[in-house]
Each structure stands twice: as C-alpha cells, then as structure tokens.
Amino acid sequence: MEVNPPKQEHLLALKVMRLTKPTLFTNIPVTCEEKDLPGDLFNQLMKDDPSTVNGAEILMLGEMLTLPQNFGNIFLGETFSSYISVHNDSNQVVKDILVKADLQTSSQRLNLSASNAAVAELKPDCCIDDVIHHEVKEIGTHILVCAVSYTTQGGEKMYFRKFFKFQVLKPLDVKTKFYNAESDLSSVTDEVFLEAQIQNITTSPMFMEKVSLEPSIMYNVTELNSVNQAGECVSTFGSRGYLQPMDTRQYLYCLKPKKEFAEKAGIIKGVTVIGKLDIVWKTNLGERGRLQTSQLQRMAPGYGDVRLSLEAIPDTVNLEEPFHITCKITNCSSERTMDLVLEMCNTTSIHWCGISGRQLGKLHPSSSLCLALTLLSSVQGLQSVSGLRLTDTFLKRTYEYDDIAQVCVVSAAVEVEA
C-alpha cells in the first residue's frame, strides 16, 4: 500500500504585500445637545479622541492616516507596486537563493524582478527584500507568480512558488464622436471636430490632470476646452478639476489637415487615422494613472464622386408657403465627365416643388453647378431637408442626400424676421 509522503517544510518563508498610499482616517461623530440626557458626554469624548481635528470634532475626516486594510482595487493605467520578502525562518545558512516574480496576463507573461542574479547565502533570521513596479496596461485577470529556489546546507536543491490572483478594472468609460465642419453654407470643409466623453466609473473622485489629443501626422489639433477671459485662458470646467464618481465630462478638439495633405484629396478620403487620446489623472493622495486610447479612426464624409452642398437657405420659413434653397453640385472626379439626373423625393413634412427626374446636363471633372430649388413644409417646428437623389446615368449609380439642412417652420400668423 502506497503512503503519500509528508509535505516537506521549506526553510524560507515568502511574503508578498501590495504597496498603496494610505487613506485619511474617518470616524462617525456622535453628538447631542447639552439639554439632552447625555449632556456634554459625547462632545467631550470626541474632543478626547486623538483621531478628530481639534476645533472641528464633528467632521468625519480626521488628521490621521490609516494603512490599507485589504488588497483594494487595481485600475487600468495605474502602477501596480508590490513588496516581496523572503525570510530565513530556519537555523541553517541557505545558499544560492533566487527570487523570481512574473506577472501573467491574458496575453503575455512579464518578468518584474529587478535582478535575476542569485544571492550567495542567507543567514538565519535574515531576509531578501525586493519592490516591483508595473504599469497595468490590460484589464481582466492578472496572476503574480513568485518563485523561490535555494540550496540547503546538505546540498539539496529546493523550489517553491506562490500565486496571487487579482482583477484589473476599467477606471474610465471613453466615448468619441466625430463631426464634419461646415464653412457657412458653401461647402463641407476638411476640418473635423472630435467630442470625447469621459466618465469616471470608479467609486472615488479623480483629479483630471491632463486630457489631450495627440494627432496623427496628417492633422493639426486645436483644443476647445478653455475660454479667454480678460486675456487669461480659463478652463470650461471651472477652477476645480475633479471628476466625481459616475460623472461625465465632454472634451472638444478641432482637427485640420496639414497643408501638404489637404491638397491631396485622395489621402483624406476613406478611413483616416485621427490620433489618440492621452488621459492622466490622480486619485488618493496623488496616486497617478494614465491611459492612452488606441488610434482613433474616422470615416471621412462619403462624397463618392459627387458632392452636394448648400449655398443659401433661410433659417425660418412659413408653414405651407414655398421657400427657395440654392444647392451646389460638384464633380469630385478628376477624370470623368458625369451626366446627372436629379430626383426629388417628398418626406412626411417636406414637399418639393418642380419636376423630379430632370436632366442636369454634363458636369466636367472638378467643376460645379448651382441649382435653385423650391420646397414647402406641411409641419411646424424644426424640419430636416431631405430627399434629394442624384443618378449618374453612365454608371447607373444613385447618390442619396438626406438631412442636408434644417429649417424652422412657423405658422403664417407668426411674423418671420428677416
């Protein structure tokens, strides 16, 4: 009959502790009025409590610091620091001690040890200490693997390891939107506005130290998150840069193609890389975190070979009364002459006046034509001008143009300002 051998005791002990900043001590003040039964008892106890602030005993926040009571949360972008100690609990001298610390993520295994050289010997009651640091760049499960190998006085080689599993959480929720700029009504420019919505999804406030956009080589960027007041730039978020838990901020940036790229329309068309956001924040007692998004990609406006833009349109029109708009149609092709047909499709609120399906004639490469159109609205309120279709008779390709612009439709009894 086989008997399992007893588990061998190791001569060395391994301790691993996470290093984090302390927190301010908080207490729950219990007070009452002097006319109540306890009298001044509670107030006197709070004054005698060393953790309270002298003269402001009823404040929950004290002057003392407390060490972390648990492992806590680790968020993406923060620096994970850990203290590793190997102590010789025996009465023997241990030789050739090698301590190795690896961090296993879902995609890679990283060596965090400061030195891979073995320590010649470790006397009784002595220890080997090491501090490791790692900027966390992945979310999900992480495993810290600490391995220790050594040689006993009898020449026996020993080895053991311990595993410490922890989760890395997401601190911020970042959403981006792109808007194509318009130069009054004449044409759509190559300028792009980026709106970045950043939400704090942790349970503690953050100090937003920096939120910047690092543009790609094709663009120059202008931050639109401050205003000029009396010659001084003031943040649109006020003097306090704190982002409370579950609060959201919106940052705005304007990107404009550099001259050498703006002149080459083919480069800007299609999917273009805009750049990446660089976010730096601080939390408890100045602990810093940093996130960089992946390269933000934006689909350039799908003009195809034909671009339609507005030259003129009224802001306000009367209900059920015709009004006029002027459209500009541009052949974006540099080689091919187009023969276009214009169709006007009514919507539930917008009705086009005129002949649909008319020939516009030949449009040469890189040339434009202006077209006056008449329409009316049967519904009050802010209405979207939609329903224009241009068909290239040679390729049998139709270009659809909806949400071209918006007009405010009011009752005829309301005077329309010029």
Curated annotation (Swiss-Prot):
Record GO cellular component, one term: TRAPPIII protein complex
Pfam families referenced in this protein's UniProt entry, alphabetically: TRAPPC13_C, TRAPPC13_M, TRAPPC13_N
Residue ranges of coiled coil: none
InterPro entries in UniProt: TRAPPC13, TRAPPC13_C, TRAPPC13_M, TRAPPC13_N
Taxonomic superkingdom: Eukaryota
Family: Belongs to the TRAPPC13 family.
Subunit structure comment from the entry: Part of the multisubunit TRAPP (transport protein particle) complex.
Protein's name in the database: Trafficking protein particle complex subunit 13
Lineage, highest ranks first: Eukaryota, Metazoa, Chordata, Craniata, Vertebrata
